[in-house]
Design a protein with these regions (language model features):
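Conserved acetyl-CoA pyrophosphate-binding loop and the N-cap/start of the following alpha-helix
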Residues: 113, 117
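PAS and PAS-like sensory/regulatory domains
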Residues: 1-3, 67, 85, 142-144, ...
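Active-site core of bacterial EAL-family cyclic-dinucleotide phosphodiesterase domains
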Residues: 42-107, 147, 179, 208
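Helix C-cap/alpha-to-beta connector motif
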Residues: 120-148, 164-175, 198-202
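Active-site-proximal loop/turn and secondary-structure-junction residues that shape catalytic pockets
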Residues: 75, 150-152, 182-184
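C-di-GMP signaling machinery
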Residues: 10-68, 78, 108-112, 150-159, ...
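The catalytic core of metal-dependent phosphodiesterases that act on cyclic dinucleotides
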Residues: 163-214, 218
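GGDEF/GGEEF active-site signature
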Residues: 1-6, 133, 160-164
Length: 219
């Protein structure tokens, strides 16, 4: 399929700037499988440029600690009791400020970085949960919810690595809930189901996470 990207040069724009915009537009063509032409205005080009910047900088951001976890309480609406907490990854860039998790998680999946990022999230969440549990009195049914991409569950030995991290932190399986993000849930393989089955056998809860926000437990 032959495609074309059309960018309207702005008044006073030099050839270098226009060439850079055209390169950004062409790089986005793979995301438009059914379009012969892609028209890129400044807003679209800014979005493409931001996506490329995220792809180039997310690994470094993780290494220098710009990526971190916050914990959203999960509350029973009837009793107002705190049932657990969901670990949510956030990115505050020194250069660009707050980066949307909906954007950087999706890009991490697109560039094949989600497994490395995902394991870092799991290690951090379990480690911080262990420290918090030692200082606070939590109920036995308190659940730590951790978002996991289907790409991670497609890995042959995910449940083994998850279990290893869990044991290293002295956590019980029934205190953890794996939240499966729905971004690419249609691209699952046989390892996906095996990993889920093995985690459930150990007592880990499994649920579906809608757009990285609200949990919906499934026993």
């Amino acid at each position: 399929i032959h495609k074309s990207a059309i960018c309207e040069p702005l008044q006073g724009e030099n050839a270098w700037s226009y060439a850079e915009k055209l390169k950004l537009a062409i790089s986005s063509i793979r995301d438009h499988m059914f379009s012969e032409f892609i028209f890129c205005d400044d807003a679209k080009l800014n979005e493409i440029e931001e996506n490329i910047w995220i792809a180039r900088n997310i690994r470094h951001a993780m290494e220098i600690g710009e990526l971190f976890l916050v914990y959203q309480p999960i509350v029973d609406i009837n009793t107002r009791a705190i049932l657990g907490a969901e670990a949510l990854c956030r990115w505050v860039s020194a250069e660009r400020g707050i980066i949307s998790p909906l954007k950087f998680i999706t890009i991490a999946e697109d560039i094949g970085f989600i497994n490395e990022l995902g394991y870092q999230i799991i290690k951090t969440a379990m480690g911080e949960f262990r420290h918090f549990s030692q200082r606070a009195s939590l109920k036995d049914d308190f659940l730590l919810h951790i978002n996991v991409s289907p790409w991670q569950l497609n890995e042959p030995h995910f449940h083994e690595r998850f279990t290893t991290i869990m044991k290293e932190n002295g956590l019980k399986a029934n205190s953890l809930c794996v939240e499966i993000t729905e971004t690419v849930i249609e691209r699952i393989n046989e390892h996906f189901y095996l990993n889920i089955e093995q985690l459930r056998k150990q007592g880990v809860r499994i649920s579906i996470c809608l757009l990285y926000t609200s949990p919906s437990p499934r026993d």
